[in-house]
Regions:
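Structural motif
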Residues: 26, 65-70, 93
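A short acidic, Gly/Pro-enriched loop at the edge of an enzyme's catalytic core
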Residues: 56-67
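Class I S-adenosylmethionine
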Residues: 1-43
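SAM/dcSAM-binding transferase cores
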Residues: 128-182
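A short glycine-rich, Lys/Arg-flanked "PGG" loop and its adjoining helix->strand segment in the class I
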Residues: 76-91, 110
Length: 182
């Protein structure tokens, strides 16, 4: 299994199995056919659009449920654009740095989104670390198990992996306390 299989599955299924009913989803940044295939597994419920950051400025206010940033670095301006279009129960997922490689960047990303979101939690899979930030739904307490368990043809993602990806070693968990909003 390639690391990008895990990336595509986790970046798509984790947020879409956390949100109660994501009808409008934007996937911003680089994507490939496998990313699109993973997203297509949610087409019965979700309208999914792919594009670059200019897609954010073309959307109406408070109209998007989920924004997934595949390789786009989040900053205050981008977050303001996302905040403008995200619904009151919306969430975002984006890549960050691993705790062991650049904890300062991980902390900075968590603090940035923590100002706008009720929940801001890092999750790990393969050699990747990403963050989910949510205005309402908790990624482990509100996982839609039926949706997660009914996804077919997966190599990495499962409901169990979904929950396990939020578990960090004790020292990292302690260091994240007060920064990550769990």
């Amino acid at each position: 299994m390639k690391d990008n299989n895990a990336f595509n599955e986790m970046m798509v299924h984790l947020p879409l199995c956390t949100h109660k009913e994501a009808s409008n989803v934007l996937i911003i940044g680089a994507n490939n056919e496998d990313m699109k295939a993973q997203a297509a597994k949610h087409n019965k419920v979700s309208n999914i659009e792919f594009g670059d950051t200019s897609l954010l400025t073309s959307k109406n206010e408070k109209n998007i449920d989920v924004v997934i940033l595949t390789d786009v670095k989040i900053d205050e301006l981008l977050l303001a654009n996302i905040e403008r279009i995200l619904k009151e129960d919306g969430l975002i997922t984006f890549t960050s740095k691993a705790f062991s490689r650049d904890e300062d960047q991980l902390f900075a990303d968590l603090k940035l989104v923590g100002t706008k979101f009720w929940i801001a939690m890092p999750f790990k899979f393969g050699h990747n670390t990403s963050i989910i930030a949510s205005k309402r739904y908790h990624p482990t307490a509100d996982i839609n198990l039926q949706r997660a368990d009914l996804l077919d043809d997966l190599n990495y993602y499962s409901a169990e992996i979904h929950n396990a990806s939020f578990v960090f070693p004790a020292s990292e968990h302690k260091a994240l306390t007060g920064i990550a909003k769990r």
